[in-house]
């Protein structure tokens, strides 16, 4: 028998506090019956005492203490079906594209199940994004979680859409899909995302979840879990390689802070909840490859660093959980370079597992290391030139200074719709390395110089 409680004791922000007489489950879905007969949905946040804390998805405006509360005994579920592909949904899974509701094959708990560490396989297959600074120097590997650290005013949304359009697993027979979840975005950004997916045809292999800035903060906490549940369904039920792009994790963390404040929790660093690390881990750790499963889940969470501060708790904690970072730099953006990715502080910890013979090319690691070394030295020399002038540099130093400019102009810079293969990326790398004297290519084995260096290929 379903019981309806009329025991709301307090309404605070997006939360209601309900007195209970029977056990209630954590994350349980709640139906709130308004006095005018309409029904709102909520979710149990805390059931440890006689007072249950419920977050209301549609907000508490118009609620009063006479409203009825029904505990359903169910958690929030995603209606999962292969028909999810090609759809644009709200942050809580309702259609936003004017289409019909999804007819589910399964109803899946959005909180997911913990992945058995013993069943995890180490990531080892290359994912081609078509962006040289990622593919060439900070390679994304299937099953990896590799965040993009950006900042306000930088083109991380454009980079996210470019990756969503272009990403593929070369040589794989399994289908590839993208799950794109945007949190706390403006109506203008939502229109931009929707039109880009539809215009470029990328929507055919994508599932898009959009949570707007004026949607309840509660929905923002649900959105990435909806997206990851959809990704797991496509990966493990349909054998697809799924790339999940989550933007912007900073808006998600702000919603966590807002909910924590409404519950009068003791704040942690900079006002964020003390459990934020654990909460972020419940999202990031859902990436991976499971033994015996054909599909896989790869994650690119995107976060904007408040005040360009990489030590801020959100990027700081994300860095501990994930396997590297791609750093978007304001300095390169000011120069008009797109994508403005600074490879020096960027890192892909699993890169070596996904490159080399049979995956990309035998010279990939050597070319990447040499470009890193040359660019780092060229950047250092820019600081020296600012003090002593270019005339004081030796011929060798001048070559490295020019190499840094070439690297930014030819390798980093590319068009918003330019999809480079890994062969294109390595070829551009070799072309700019010809600017350095051959005796300075100390990080590249001589056999690769003989085989791939443009000067030697012409001689043959």
Curated annotation (Swiss-Prot):
Recorded GO MF terms: ATP binding; proton-transporting ATP synthase activity, rotational mechanism
Cell location: Cell membrane
UniProt keyword annotations, A-Z: ATP synthesis, Cell membrane, Hydrogen ion transport, Ion transport, Membrane, Transport
Domain of life where this protein originates: Archaea
Membrane topology of the entry: Peripheral membrane protein
UniProt-listed Pfam families: ATP-synt_ab (PF00006), ATP-synt_ab_N (PF02874), ATP-synt_VA_C (PF22919)
GO biological process: proton motive force-driven plasma membrane ATP synthesis
Keyword Ion transport: yes
Gene Ontology CC annotations of this record: plasma membrane; proton-transporting two-sector ATPase complex, catalytic domain
Function: Component of the A-type ATP synthase that produces ATP from ADP in the presence of a proton gradient across the membrane. The B chain is a regulatory subunit.
Entry's family note: Belongs to the ATPase alpha/beta chains family.
Subunit architecture: Has multiple subunits with at least A(3), B(3), C, D, E, F, H, I and proteolipid K(x).
Protein name per Swiss-Prot or TrEMBL: A-type ATP synthase subunit B
Species, as recorded: Methanosarcina acetivorans (strain ATCC 35395 / DSM 2834 / JCM 12185 / C2A)
């Amino acid at each position: 028998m379903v019981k309806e409680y009329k025991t709301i004791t307090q309404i605070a922000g997006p939360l209601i506090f309900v007195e209970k007489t029977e056990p209630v489950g954590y994350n349980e879905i709640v139906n709130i019956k308004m006095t005018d007969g309409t029904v709102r949905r909520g979710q149990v946040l805390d059931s440890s005492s006689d007072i249950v804390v419920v977050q209301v998805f549609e907000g508490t405006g118009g609620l009063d203490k006479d409203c009825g509360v029904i505990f359903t005994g169910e958690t929030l579920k995603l209606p999962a079906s292969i028909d999810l592909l090609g759809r644009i949904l709200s942050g809580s899974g309702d259609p936003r594209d004017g289409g019909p509701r999804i007819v589910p094959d399964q109803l899946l708990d959005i909180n997911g199940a913990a992945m058995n560490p013993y069943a995890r396989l180490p990531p080892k297959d290359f994912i081609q994004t078509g962006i040289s600074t990622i593919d060439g120097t900070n390679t994304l590997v299937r099953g990896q979680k590799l965040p993009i650290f950006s900042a306000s005013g930088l083109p991380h949304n454009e980079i996210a859409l470019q990756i969503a359009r272009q990403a593929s697993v070369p040589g794989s027979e399994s289908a590839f899909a993208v799950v794109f979840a945007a949190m706390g975005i403006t109506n203008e950004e939502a229109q931009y995302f929707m039109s880009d997916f539809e215009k470029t045809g990328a929507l055919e292999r994508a599932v898009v979840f959009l949570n707007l800035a004026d949607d309840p903060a509660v929905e923002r906490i649900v959105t990435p879990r909806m997206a990851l549940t959809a990704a797991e369904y496509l990966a493990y039920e349909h054998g697809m390689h799924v790339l999940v792009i989550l933007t912007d994790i900073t808006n998600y963390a702000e919603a966590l802070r807002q909910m924590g404040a409404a519950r009068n929790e003791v704040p942690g660093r900079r006002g964020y909840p003390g459990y934020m690390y654990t909460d972020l881990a419940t999202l990031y750790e859902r990436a991976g490859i499971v033994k015996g499963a054909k599909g896989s889940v790869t994650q690119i969470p995107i976060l904007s660093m408040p005040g360009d501060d990489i030590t801020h708790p959100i990027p700081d904690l994300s860095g501990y959980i994930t396997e590297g970072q791609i750093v978007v730099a304001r300095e390169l953006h000011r120069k008009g370079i797109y994508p403005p990715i600074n490879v020096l502080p960027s890192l892909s910890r699993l890169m070596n597992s996904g490159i080399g013979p049979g995956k990309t090319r035998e010279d990939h690691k050597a070319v990447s290391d040499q470009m890193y070394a040359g660019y780092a030295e060229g950047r250092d020399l820019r600081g020296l030139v600012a003090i002593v002038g270019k005339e004081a540099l030796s011929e060798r130093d001048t070559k490295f200074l020019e190499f840094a400019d070439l690297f930014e102009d030819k390798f980093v810079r590319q068009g918003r719709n330019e999809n480079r293969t890994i062969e294109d990326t390595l070829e551009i790398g070799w072309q700019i390395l010809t600017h350095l004297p051959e005796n300075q290519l100390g990080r590249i084995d001589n056999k690769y110089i003989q085989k791939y260096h443009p000067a030697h290929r012409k001689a043959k």
